[in-house]
């Protein structure tokens, strides 16, 4: 008995005071994702990278909104979302306690206004994403604020309409070249 007490005093506590004191985790621990909708541009990079499909993004054309959703019950804490996010809107925290009374508490959502194409009216991207792209071009020095605003209709044109416009423009150039070559002969 004395031997057991001697060993117990020598090695101290074998357990931690976890519920009473917060438990220290490794600095590289990947816990609950923390999402900041103010920083998010709704680009969808995180939803494409998520292997567990814990992140989803749905566009409602009638409402003109894009809804981002995180289902914590599906998250495998791989940090792919954090790696691909261009604005650092989602980060994995040190928090590991995720027990909830209500299953709906495992869901996080955010809504974003969707930009509709200036030519066909189809929704295609979040307005915040377009504004972010324009701001990046201004910040890089490729455009001034005024030039960016002048080109806003180009930014707010969907890829399909841009493709159609380029094909039409390309056909005119080809026709012009053909006529020029015939006139020269």
Which residues fall in each region the model found?
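Non-ligating segments of multi-cofactor redox enzymes
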Residues: 1-61, 65, 71-74, 80-185
């Amino acid at each position: 008995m004395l031997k057991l007490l001697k060993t117990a005093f020598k090695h101290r506590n074998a357990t931690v005071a976890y519920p009473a004191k917060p438990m220290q985790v490794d600095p590289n621990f990947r816990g609950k994702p923390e999402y900041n909708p103010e920083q998010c541009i709704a680009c969808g990079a995180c939803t494409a990278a998520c292997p567990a499909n814990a992140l989803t993004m749905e566009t409602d054309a009638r409402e003109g909104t894009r809804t981002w959703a995180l289902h914590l019950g599906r998250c495998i804490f791989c940090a792919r979302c954090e790696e691909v996010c261009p604005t650092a809107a989602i980060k994995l925290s040190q928090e590991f306690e995720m027990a909830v009374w209500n299953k709906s508490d495992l869901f996080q959502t955010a809504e974003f206004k969707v930009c509709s194409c200036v030519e066909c009216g189809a929704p295609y991207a979040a307005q915040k994403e377009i504004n972010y792209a324009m701001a990046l071009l201004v910040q890089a020095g490729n455009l001034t604020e005024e030039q960016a605003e002048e080109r806003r209709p180009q930014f707010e044109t969907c890829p399909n309409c841009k493709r159609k416009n380029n094909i039409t423009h390309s056909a005119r150039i080809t026709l012009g070249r053909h006529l020029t070559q015939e006139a020269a002969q």
